[in-house]
């Protein structure tokens, strides 16, 4: 999974220069698609089963009060927006097995045949981006959410329990006046993108499955300025928003638990083993 994680991290690094006021949000989706075709990588979110429709895009792009799974679309980013970009990508593939450049990413049914049954190396990561100059409220939310991510990862030690992760995140976020989304959680990874165990970002220490060496997990706290409660877009069954219109932020890393501590697989260069 290292190759997949390195490639996904390079995408997020590239987005740092792309995302700015006036950018059409759809260009984020186009950038990810282009990079995937150049490096022969499958965007694994295309074709994921949904309650009302299969997910049709390579990215999830949430703005301000959007919590998760929002569709990329034509929207001009504004000064002060808070953007979250989430994606799941394969490792670079051998073209003799599959030539990704020849796939039609807009044909969801066709893509589903390649993505849903994929069982190779993959990586899952979401990152938040400040669009231009943002308010202190946005800065503080981003800081606390990022801190929640690393506080949770630090708890992913051999012998600890799943509940230790969520309890640490919840205690930190709520002590600073923020809400922790309950409906959407982290998860195990491999050989498919969503595996047991589920990893809540809230809970009680000392509870849940005991963590073992070799487990690959994601931690992806969604932290809100107001209540933790969210609504779902019933037209698509995918996008979520805060019910009170408050801001929501998310950061996500995928990592493997080693005897020496968690090793981040989607590191953008500033992280390592705790």
Where do the model's predicted regions map?
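Active-site neighborhoods and metal-handling regions in enzymes and metal-associated proteins
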Residues: 1-274
